[in-house]
Each structure stands twice: as C-alpha cells, then as structure tokens.
Amino acid sequence: MLRERATAPASTPRSRVAISFGSPAGESGVTRLDLNEILIRNPQAAFLVRIAGSAMREAGIDDGDLALVDRALDANHGQVVIAVHQNEFLCRRLCRRDEALGLQATDSDVPDIWASEADNVDVWGVVTHVIKQVSG
C-alpha cells in the first residue's frame, strides 16, 4: 500500500538512489540538502533564467524551465549558453569556427546565428543546470 506523507521529511537523504529509498524507518546518515552548495560553484556569478520557447528542446531544455547560469565560467565550443543578440536573450549551443562565433538551437526550425564583427553578440554565461517542474 502506498501512503502519502502529510508533511515534508525533516531531512533528505544525501546518497545516490538507483530505484528505491529503502526503509523509511532507517534514517541514519540523513543530512539536509543545500542546493546552493550542490549546484552553484561561483555564487557571486550565478543567476537563474526562465526559459521561453522551444529552441533547445532537443537538449532537454523546455519552455518554462529554470536555467542556472554561471558567468564566471569560460564558454567553450559545444556548451549551452545564455547570450544576447540584437538586444534579445537567447539560450543556445555555442559554436566556434576559426574566428566566427555561432549560436545554434537544437530545433531545426530555428536558424543558426553566426556573428560577424558587425553583430553584437554577448555571451552572458554557461548554463550549468536546468530545473524542471514535473508536477503541479
């Protein structure tokens, strides 16, 4: 019989779980999770962005997701970044070819952006984690 717990647990296990939580009676080794500690490497340079649109759906980033962005990290080829192009924030995969800078969506209906010297593209930071709402 599956029972819903009326209140949140006092603390959350901090271990890897493959398929089950084990016995609810055995709470040894339980500590509180600090998502700041787990997810954020550079607290002064981290911020959250709410994703709008489906341009990065094939990368698992959907409309309404929260993206954790780290501005202290160097953006490398192939990483998902938040960038500003023509005064618009974009979530795209960064591409570098020779001296050219590209922003690619995973949705084939969204055109790639290749920055020339005339374009104003500013990479704000690297997306390190994506937070999804799965219920509610």
What are these regions (language model features)?
Residues 64-65, 79:
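Structural motif
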Residues 61-62, 75:
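Short, well-ordered loop/turn sites that connect or cap secondary structure elements
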